[in-house]
């Protein structure tokens, strides 16, 4: 199926993480123009040569916890390419195992700075550009933590629920100028962040042992992959999903089938 993304300008936030890299490669294969961000120039330099199918690629150093960085990156992309047709946000942070009775400001703060405020600043400044250009599409990598919670990581659960509310608000506001907002909610995702999850919940287990244990929570007995995420990003970025607005695309292997 031709997703008609070839001539689109795609901004991929946090493109050098596991999910971001898989997403960037998938959109490069569609022949898109790619603007990719990372907190590290060295990581951008390593990623860009891998995106051979893209029409054009340029990297931008950006820390999404800093609004000024996000604003500068968005302005630079528009200066370089004229517009932003699609914005894909792939950042994420889980943190440490910490129960509510042991909660610290620092742990909640870093979760909200990355997962919530980072998303807010991207929505704010990309949304402004999409209002100017009368349209666009935004897809955010969220989490099944946006609708279910695990004990022991309350900061993560709280901010992911907050992100879902923020995205639903953005979906309502942004359709006034023709921009769609949707988000993806994977369950256990086989990335470097999963190593932190294994450490948090299964101390003493190897990563492989932890993944095997976690996989049994899903009806298909496997974790979500970065390729699953990239394919969902392609779908939501394209007009194939044009009637989806403010929706969560769940990639959770049926984990929460009784709660949806």
Task: Annotate the PLM regions.
Residues 175, 180, 244-246:
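Short, small/polar-rich loop/turn modules that mediate ligand/substrate recognition or access, typified
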Residues 98-100, 104-112, 214:
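Substrate-binding pocket helix/loop in short-chain dehydrogenase/reductase
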């Amino acid at each position: 199926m031709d997703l008609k993304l070839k001539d689109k300008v795609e901004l991929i936030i946090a493109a050098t993480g596991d999910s971001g890299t898989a997403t960037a490669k998938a959109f490069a294969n569609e022949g898109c123009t790619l603007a990719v961000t990372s907190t590290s120039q060295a990581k951008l330099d390593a990623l860009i040569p891998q995106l051979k199918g893209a029409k054009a690629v340029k990297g931008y150093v950006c820390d999404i916890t800093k609004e000024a960085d996000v604003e500068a990156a968005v302005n630079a992309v528009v200066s370089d390419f004229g517009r932003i047709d699609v914005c894909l946000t792939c950042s994420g942070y889980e943190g440490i195992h910490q129960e509510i009775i042991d909660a610290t400001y620092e742990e909640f703060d870093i979760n909200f700075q990355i997962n919530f405020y980072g998303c807010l600043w991207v929505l704010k400044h990309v949304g402004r550009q999409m209002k100017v250009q009368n349209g666009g599409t935004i897809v955010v990598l969220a989490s099944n933590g946006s609708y279910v919670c695990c004990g022991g990581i309350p900061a993560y659960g709280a901010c992911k629920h907050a992100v879902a509310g923020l995205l639903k608000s953005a979906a309502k506001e942004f359709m006034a100028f023709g921009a769609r907002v949707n988000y993806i909610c994977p369950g256990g995702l086989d990335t470097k962040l999963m190593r932190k999850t294994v450490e948090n919940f299964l101390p003493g287990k190897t990563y492989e042992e932890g993944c095997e244990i976690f996989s049994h929570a899903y009806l298909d007995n496997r974790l979500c992959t970065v390729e699953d995420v990239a394919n969902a990003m392609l779908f939501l970025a394209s007009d194939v999903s044009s009637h989806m607005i403010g929706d969560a695309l769940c990639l959770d292997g049926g984990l929460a089938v009784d709660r949806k």
